Each structure stands twice: as structure tokens, then as C-alpha cells.
């Protein structure tokens, strides 16, 4: 059963193939940590959202419960070994561990969302910070002068 108003797209998160103020919501799950220029991607998402439109990000994050750290580190070290055993290639699983470690912590990502122009920014930790859901809203303001770089030549 399809939904006429629901659209899934695949593209460069830093240069979205969408006009300004064209989305009611944007969701990215376990993908932001793979984006090279996260600030640019967040700005592009804000421009693509209609005023009041919501962004929701589900991503691995940083532990908030220090008691979980030894178990988490041990578990993280197993990913490449299990990946090697199952697929014969440890490198994607090593990348997973490294990309999680390099991803901004909860407060840094919250600040990045605010810098990108989102309002009502916050986050909820899941599983003691193993993952977090960040959210923000495109502000209600006149953005007629804002330009999505993907469509700059069309404006």
C-alpha cells in the first residue's frame, strides 16, 4: 500500500536534489555519521524543510552511563571479528566502529543543528547513549532569500 504524499529519495545529503521548503519532514537513520560535511548536510536539510518542518536523526552516539563503557568497548571490538567470520571481510565492520567513535557527541550534534538554523532542537538518548534521536524544526521565517545550492542556477 503506497502513500501518494510519501516520497523516498536517494542523493547527496550535502546537496539535496530538492527545492527549498519542499519537505514536511526529513528523517535520516544511521547515515549522518557517514556524511563528510555534516554541517553542510544539516543546512541543506533545513533549507529543504518547510517552515515548521521537522528533522529527526537516529544515530549511534556516546555513552552516558560510564558503567557501560567496558562492555561497550568489548562489544565494539567484536564487530570486525564477527564480520570477518560471517562475510570474510572485516573492513566494513572496522569502519562501523571507527565511524561511531568519530561521530559528534550528543551536545555537539545539538549545537550543530542550532548553528544550521534549526529551532526547538533536542535529543533523547537510547540504551544509555549507545544511540540518540536528535530533532529540530525549520523556523517560521521568511526564507525567500535562502538558496539551496542544488537549485542556485534555477533561481
Locate predicted features.
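Core SAM-dependent methyltransferase catalytic element
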Residues: 110, 116-155
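A short glycine-rich, Lys/Arg-flanked "PGG" loop and its adjoining helix->strand segment in the class I
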Residues: 39-54
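C-terminal alpha-helical "lid/dimerization" subdomain adjacent to the S-adenosyl-L-methionine
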Residues: 58-116, 122
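A short SAM/SAH-binding and catalytic strip from SAM-dependent methyltransferases
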Residues: 24-38
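Conserved SAM-binding strand-loop segment of SAM-dependent methyltransferases
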Residues: 2-14
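A short acidic, Gly/Pro-enriched loop at the edge of an enzyme's catalytic core
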Residues: 14-25
Amino acid at each position: 500500500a503506497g502513500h501518494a504524499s510519501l516520497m523516498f529519495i536517494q542523493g547527496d545529503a550535502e546537496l539535496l536534489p530538492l527545492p527549498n521548503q519542499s519537505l514536511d519532514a526529513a528523517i535520516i537513520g544511521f547515515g549522518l555519521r557517514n556524511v563528510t560535511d555534516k554541517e553542510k548536510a544539516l543546512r541543506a536539510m533545513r533549507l529543504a524543510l518547510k517552515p515548521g518542518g521537522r528533522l529527526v536523526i537516529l544515530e549511534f552516539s556516546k555513552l552516558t552511563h560510564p558503567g557501560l563503557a567496558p562492555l561497550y568497548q568489548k562489544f565494539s571490538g567484536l564487530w570486525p571479528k564477527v564480520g570477518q567470520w560471517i562475510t570474510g571481510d572485516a573492513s566494513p565492520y572496522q569502519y562501523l566502529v571507527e565511524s561511531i567513535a568519530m561521530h559528534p557527541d550528543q551536545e555537539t550534534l545539538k549545537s550543530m543543528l542550532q548553528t544550521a538554523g534549526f529551532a526547538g532542537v533536542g535529543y533523547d538518548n537510547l540504551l544509555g547513549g549507545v544511540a540518540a534521536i536528535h530533532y529540530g524544526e525549520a523556523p517560521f521565517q521568511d526564507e525567500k532569500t535562502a538558496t539551496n545550492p542544488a537549485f542556485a542556477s534555477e533561481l
